[in-house]
Design a protein with these regions (language model features):
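Short, conserved DNA-binding cores of transcription-related domains
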Residues: 2-106, 354, 365, 369
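C-terminal domain-tail junction helix/linker
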Residues: 31, 37, 42, 311-314, ...
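RNase H-like nuclease fold core
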Residues: 145-232, 238, 242-243, 250
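Residues immediately flanking
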Residues: 174, 236, 260, 377
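Short, positively charged, Gly/Tyr-enriched micro-motifs
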Residues: 95-182
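Extended amphipathic alpha-helical interaction segments
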Residues: 10, 21-24, 218-233, 240-364, ...
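Short small-residue beta-strand/loop micro-motif enriched in glycine and branched aliphatics
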Residues: 98-101, 194-199, 353-357
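Long C-terminal interaction/binding lobes of large macromolecular proteins
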Residues: 24-47, 212, 217-219, 250, ...
Length: 423
C-alpha cells in the first residue's frame, strides 16, 4: 500500500474536428459464416446473386449509388493471419472502390467471431484483460485493441440502422472517471435503451462538453442531416444544458426530477412520509395537477420543522417546479435520468475493474466507445420460464437483426464503420 503511484504522461486534449471517415469505412461487411464463405466466395456468379438479394433486404449495408451497378473486380491477397481467407473487391459503376468482408472475420484479420465471441462478452462485463488472456491466450494488448477497434465505428450509425428509428427523446450525463491519475469526464448520451454517444474530455465546462457531445451530433447527422431531438434529460449542471442548446438550438432540456429527490433523501434518509409525498407530486398526470400537488406539498412541509440542509433542498425543489413541469409539454420524454444512470452504473463497474483509464485521449475514448457497442449488442440474460422477444438493446431499438449470433450482428451493423456513404 506504500508503493509510489506511477502515472505515465498522456495526451488529455481532444483532437480537432475530424473531416474524413475513419479507417474501415470502405469495407462492407456481409452476413456470412465460414460454411457459406467456402461455398460462395470464389464463385463470382453466386456472389453476385447473393449481393443482389442482400441489396433488396438490407440496402443500408451498402453505399448509396450501388443501385446504379457494380462489378466484382477480384480478390485481395490471402491473409497471413488467417490462412485461406481472402477479401473481395467491389467497384461501383459511378466510381468508388470497396472491400467485401464476411462477418465471421474480424477487421484487420485479427481473428474470427468464434474465437473472440465469449472473451468479448466477458470484457463487456468488466472482466480484466489479464483474466481473459489467461483463459483464451494472446496477450492483454490483443484484447484491448479488439475493443478499441470497435470504437472506431460510428456509435450512432452502428446501433441505429434505420433513420426513422432515431430516438426523439434523449438523456445525457457526465461520469467522473479516474484518468491517468487525474479526473476526466465521460460524456454519455442515451436513447431508446442504448448508449448512442460516449466522449472523453478533460473538463466539464461549456466548451469541452459542447465538443464532447458534438461527436453524437456529427454521427447522427450522418444518418439524418435534418435530425434534431425533441428533448434531452439532464441534471442541473448548466454546462451540460448549455452544450446541448448550442448543438441543437430547438431542443427542449428536461430537468431530472430524480436528482431533486436525491438531494433531499441524502439529507434525511429515514423520513419515508416525506419521500412518499415527493413521488406523489411526480406522479401527477397533467401539468395543472402537478402544479397543484407541488403547492400542496410546499404548504405541508413549510408547516414543519426541518434541519437547515433539508429545508434548503426542499426550497430548491420548489424553485425548479417550472423546469420539472416542462416535461408535460413533451409526451414520451424522459422525466428522470434513469436511462443514462443505469448505463452509467455499468460503465462505473467496468472502469472500477480496470482502475480507471490509463491511455491517451484518443485510445481511451475508443475503448469506451468499443465497450458501448458491446453493451448495445451483447445478448440479454435469459429469462426464467419465457423466451425474450429481442436479442439485445440494439435489436429492440431496430426491430431487426442481421444474424442470430450477437457478434455477427454487431460486425454486420458496423458495415462501412457504421457510416452512410454516397458516391
Amino acid at each position: 500500500m506504500d508503493a509510489r503511484q506511477r502515472t505515465r504522461t498522456c495526451v488529455r486534449t481532444r483532437a480537432g474536428q475530424k473531416t474524413g471517415l475513419p479507417r474501415g469505412a470502405r469495407q462492407i461487411c456481409l452476413p456470412m459464416d465460414r460454411e457459406n464463405y467456402d461455398r460462395l466466395w470464389s464463385d463470382a456468379a453466386a456472389m453476385r446473386q447473393y449481393l443482389d438479394e442482400l441489396l433488396k433486404s438490407c440496402p443500408e449495408l451498402f453505399p448509396t449509388g450501388i443501385e446504379h451497378g457494380f462489378q466484382l473486380t477480384g480478390h485481395l491477397p490471402e491473409s497471413k493471419k488467417l490462412p485461406g481467407i481472402r477479401l473481395r473487391q467491389l467497384r461501383l459503376t459511378k466510381g468508388g472502390v470497396f472491400t467485401l468482408r464476411p462477418s465471421f472475420v474480424l477487421t484487420y484479420m485479427a481473428g474470427t467471431v468464434d474465437d473472440v465471441d465469449y472473451p468479448l462478452l466477458l470484457l463487456s462485463f468488466g472482466v480484466p484483460t489479464w483474466v481473459v488472456t489467461r483463459g483464451f491466450g494472446h496477450n492483454d494488448m490483443y484484447w484491448q485493441r479488439l475493443v478499441e477497434r470497435l470504437g472506431r465505428n460510428s456509435l450512432v450509425g452502428t446501433t441505429v440502422r434505420d433513420p426513422k428509428r432515431l430516438p426523439q427523446h434523449l438523456a445525457a450525463d457526465e461520469h467522473h472517471a479516474a484518468w491517468c491519475g487525474e479526473k476526466g469526464y465521460a460524456a454519455l448520451t442515451a436513447g431508446a435503451g442504448c448508449l448512442l454517444g460516449v466522449a472523453l474530455t478533460e473538463a466539464a465546462d461549456d466548451d469541452h462538453l459542447r465538443d464532447a457531445y458534438g461527436t453524437f451530433r456529427d454521427e447522427v447527422r450522418n444518418i439524418d442531416p435534418t435530425y434534431t431531438p425533441k428533448t434531452v434529460n439532464t441534471d442541473g449542471w448548466k454546462a451540460t444544458q448549455n452544450a446541448w442548446h448550442g448543438l441543437f438550438p430547438l431542443l427542449a432540456v428536461i430537468l431530472c426530477f430524480l436528482h431533486g429527490f436525491l438531494k433531499i433523501r441524502d439529507r434525511i434518509r429515514k423520513d419515508h412520509e416525506l419521500h412518499r409525498r415527493i413521488w406523489d407530486v411526480y406522479r401527477a398526470a397533467t401539468r395543472i395537477e402537478f402544479a397543484k400537488r407541488m403547492r400542496d406539498f410546499r404548504h405541508w412541509w413549510q408547516g414543519k420543522s426541518w434541519a437547515g440542509p433539508v429545508r434548503e433542498a426542499l426550497e430548491k425543489l420548489w424553485n425548479h417546479r417550472r423546469e420539472y413541469a416542462t416535461s408535460y409539454q413533451h409526451p414520451g420524454c424522459h422525466r428522470t435520468s434513469n436511462l443514462v444512470d443505469r448505463l452509467t452504473n455499468r460503465l462505473y463497474r467496468v472502469l472500477y475493474a480496470g482502475r480507471g483509464l490509463h491511455g491517451h485521449q484518443a485510445s481511451s475514448e475508443r475503448r469506451l466507445r468499443g465497450w458501448a457497442l458491446l453493451l448495445n449488442f451483447r445478448p440479454y440474460a435469459p429469462r426464467s420460464g419465457e423466451p425474450r422477444t429481442h436479442q439485445s438493446p440494439a435489436h429492440r431499438l431496430n426491430h431487426k437483426k442481421y444474424h442470430d449470433h450477437w457478434l455477427h450482428n454487431l460486425q454486420i451493423s458496423a458495415s462501412m464503420a457504421g457510416y452512410r456513404q454516397s458516391t
